[in-house]
Amino acid sequence: MAQHTVYFPDAFLTQMREAMPSTLSFDDFLAACQRPLRRSIRVNTLKISVADFLQLTAPYGWTLTPIPWCEEGFWIERDNEDALPLGSTAEHLSGLFYIQEASSMLPVAALFADGNAPQRVMDVAAAPGSKTTQIAARMNNEGAILANEFSASRVKVLHANISRCGISNVALTHFDGRVFGAAVPEMFDAILLDAPCSGEGVVRKDPDALKNWSPESNQEIAATQRELIDSAFHALRPGGTLVYSTCTLNQEENEAVCLWLKETYPDAVEFLPLGDLFPGANKALTEEGFLHVFPQIYDCEGFFVARLRKTQAIPALPAPKYKVGNFPFSPVKDREAGQIRQAAAGVGLNWDENLRLWQRDKELWLFPVDIEALIGKVRFSRLGIKLAETHNKGYRWQHEAVIALATPDNVNAFELTPQEAEEWYRGRDVYPQAAPVADDVLVTFQHQPIGLAKRIGSRLKNSYPRELVRDGKLFTGNA
């Protein structure tokens, strides 16, 4: 694999020499940093099993190497990487996999270790969505996830990835993560804080990642991280699990932050060792039981993961002074909900008791039941999935609902050819050789729902959202 030149400040190298265990080679560290990062993907088990995915992609000649800490994760090598970006494959467009760095699969593995099965989870710094979508898959779309993102520009990307993967149990918020301890005290069974950091571990992906690095900057970042972990710990219920992670390598932003929390709440913080998380985890194990992953250990990004348990309640923070405002939705009455459910089933959309119908004007939404306790405590950017808009003739079903709720065994499902599917993703109407009988058609490709279409004569009218329309070369190889 080709080398690339990474910029290393001298002070950073000095710091790494001091931080690295004697069992590891510093020369190996430098060599690993100069190698480009291996590509990796995670199969979205909400859409397809790992076995079925491997069978589906077998003809492509992809070399898929299992990632030890994630059963559905694989390092991927392809002969035609330049010819077709992974993001333009049919399997990616339909949400069958997520392009995710192998190290970043570790925090969610830690969150669900030892049979942990939380019902209400918070992802404090969620964009672009790799870990939120991984959490949702582990929860099988049950329970609820509060996915927060401080950066307004990244909330849109977060929602797009959640929607593409067919996730229905997520509420999005846009806050500074430091507000949650006061706003929603002790309300979560599990919390992932993948904290903003100095990014020392990402040089294999970005050779210039350390251009603005300084020890002083690390100290400032660590101060913010302490405030974030304190807030997250307050939002965690007694008995709950907190996973703290970063993609950086210095101890000040990693071990020291966790030790600060334990010093602050000595009777309430228990470190849960991660040495048995996967075979070989002991190679990165610290004396506290954390995983400090230098890039040469597993040939991946540098990363840090700690798992903590809150053993008892702690004093509450002062109540927040902001006002959330009136919640603009109201629950749909049972009789009407039954009618809506019946109409939705007619086009192949079904849901279970984990989701409940709410209404705002002419909009119908499905919210995860386990998020309802947070209504009135935080302001949501987006909650659950938009099911439909009502109009005089019935319902206008929404694309995100189709991707999350439809199953391909519906009587009105219509399987497209590869060429027709590509036309669909380009936002064009489709003219199949044999037109379907039904007027409302559940369009599928590779037996995966990819949208709803109206049959108009011999034409299938495209309803693919404009913002998702693709151009350029796609999976059939035609531009």
Swiss-Prot record:
Binding site for S-adenosyl-L-methionine: 125-131, 149, 176, 194
CDD domains linked to this entry: AdoMet_MTases
Entry keyword set: Cytoplasm, Methyltransferase, RNA-binding, rRNA processing, S-adenosyl-L-methionine, Transferase
Organism: Shigella boydii serotype 4 (strain Sb227)
Catalytic activity entry: cytidine(1407) in 16S rRNA + S-adenosyl-L-methionine = 5-methylcytidine(1407) in 16S rRNA + S-adenosyl-L-homocysteine + H(+)
Location within or outside the cell: Cytoplasm
Documented EC number(s): 2.1.1.178
Active-site residue numbers: 247 (nucleophile)
Domain of life: Bacteria
Protein name per the record: Ribosomal RNA small subunit methyltransferase F
GO molecular function terms noted in the UniProt entry: RNA binding; rRNA (cytosine-C5-)-methyltransferase activity
Role noted for this protein: Specifically methylates the cytosine at position 1407 (m5C1407) of 16S rRNA.
GO terms, biological process: rRNA base methylation
Cited HAMAP family: 16SrRNA_methyltr_F
Gene: rsmF
InterPro entries membership: Methyltr_RsmF_N, MeTrfase_RsmB-F_NOP2_cat, MeTrfase_RsmB-F_NOP2_dom, Nol1_Nop2_Fmu_2, Nop2p, RCMT, rRNA_ssu_MeTfrase_F, RsmB/NOL1/NOP2-like_CS
GO cellular component: cytoplasm
Family: Belongs to the class I-like SAM-binding methyltransferase superfamily. RsmB/NOP family.
